């Protein structure tokens, strides 16, 4: 019997996998709870089977593009099963594929175990919010949850620009248009420029990949729109530095001012293994653009202080570092101590905190919190 991509995807969904990996000469592999596992009862894939499965998901235009570029991103749906994000590529002269399972249900902030401040960020009416992390860290899932929260609570016009469209949003209180790159529009920057003429309240840009897209996103946020996007950065400090570095040196001072004026929050996340072995849970760093943080963005010599400011802003602003997030997950018994220590930026300090021993970092955080409070009072005058 011919190997069917739909049957393999059904196996992926049944096994609660996040991804399906296909390679000529190998059994299919599933990524379950972060680990790759072969489906050994399925025969090794032949070149002909791989090409047939890949082409069965493509339109004629997509087939032509793949033949020309040997790379293709697309979305694929199976009735009664779900939607999948597909990347098709060439490796060692053969076709390879990775298919990401897109959950059919958009989960809430609470269901995703995201910190409560995320819900507050969704109440912002204008500005820029960035969700960052490595590939597979759950950025799209978090963004979908935030957009769905706005959709349920505000009568807004929401435009999403994605490559490809992943989560399908249905109109609730809001009116949503979803546009897919190379299907509904040429690219992110073109769609974003056009979107400014479509009376939007909220714009989701799937990824800020280039200078033009970043510039237009900043302009959109500056002119009174709420803009959400993603970057492949590890934390808030790297995110700020990455955006600034995209621009030529003569423009960077102005971009710092523009970014400080528009940025509302940076949410960076990593997935860590649950203590009950039932999947993974996000460890999340949250930076809120307070007056002190804005000053750190404007002044290049102070950008390095952003991490310390996040650590000091927990009680007043709801900010948190990755290590603070890990500590919270550990105290809630969602992750094990071994998992927390293996993921912590400073394992020694983490151990001291568990033991209730005050560290030099605690004193530094208190001093930073005092400086931030003084700065905020001065900024309000």
Regions found by a protein language model. Give the residues of each.
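Short, flexible helix-loop junctions that flank or precede catalytic/ligand sites
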Residues: 1-381
């Amino acid at each position: 019997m011919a190997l069917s991509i739909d049957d393999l995807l059904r196996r992926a969904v049944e096994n609660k996998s996040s991804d399906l990996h296909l390679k000529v000469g190998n059994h299919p592999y599933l990524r379950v709870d972060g680990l790759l596992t072969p489906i050994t009862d399925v025969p090794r894939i032949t070149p002909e089977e791989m090409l047939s499965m890949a082409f069965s998901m493509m339109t004629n235009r997509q087939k032509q593009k793949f033949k020309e570029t040997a790379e293709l991103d697309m979305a694929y749906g199976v009735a009664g099963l779900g939607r999948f994000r597909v990347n098709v590529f060439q490796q060692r002269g053969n076709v390879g594929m990775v298919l990401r399972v897109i959950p059919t249900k958009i989960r809430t902030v609470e269901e995703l175990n995201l910190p409560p401040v995320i819900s507050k960020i969704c109440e912002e009416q204008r500005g820029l919010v960035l969700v960052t992390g490595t590939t597979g860290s759950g950025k799209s899932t978090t963004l979908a949850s935030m957009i769905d929260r706005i959709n349920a609570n505000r009568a807004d016009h929401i435009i999403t620009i994605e490559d490809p469209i992943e989560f399908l949003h249905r109109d609730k209180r809001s009116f949503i248009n979803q546009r897919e790159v190379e299907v509904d529009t040429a690219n992110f920057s073109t769609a974003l420029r056009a979107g400014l003429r479509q009376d939007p309240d909220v714009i989701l840009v799937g990824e800020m990949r280039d200078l033009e897209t970043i510039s237009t996103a900043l302009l959109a946020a500056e002119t009174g729109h709420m803009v959400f996007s993603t970057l492949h950065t590890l934390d808030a400090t790297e995110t700020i530095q990455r955006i600034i570095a995209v621009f030529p040196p003569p423009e960077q001072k102005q971009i710092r001012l523009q970014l400080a004026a528009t940025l509302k929050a940076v949410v960076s996340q990593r997935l860590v293994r649950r203590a009950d072995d039932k999947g993974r849970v996000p460890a999340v760093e949250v930076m809120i653009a307070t007056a002190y943080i804005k000053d750190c963005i404007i002044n290049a010599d102070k950008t390095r202080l952003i991490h310390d400011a996040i650590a000091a802003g927990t009680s007043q602003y709801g900010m948190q570092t990755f290590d603070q997030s890990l500590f919270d997950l550990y105290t809630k018994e969602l992750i094990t101590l071994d998992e927390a220590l293996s993921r912590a930026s400073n394992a020694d300090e983490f151990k001291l905190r568990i033991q209730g021993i005050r560290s030099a970092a605690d004193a530094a955080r208190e001093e930073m919190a005092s400086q931030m409070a003084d700065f905020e009072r001065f900024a309000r005058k």
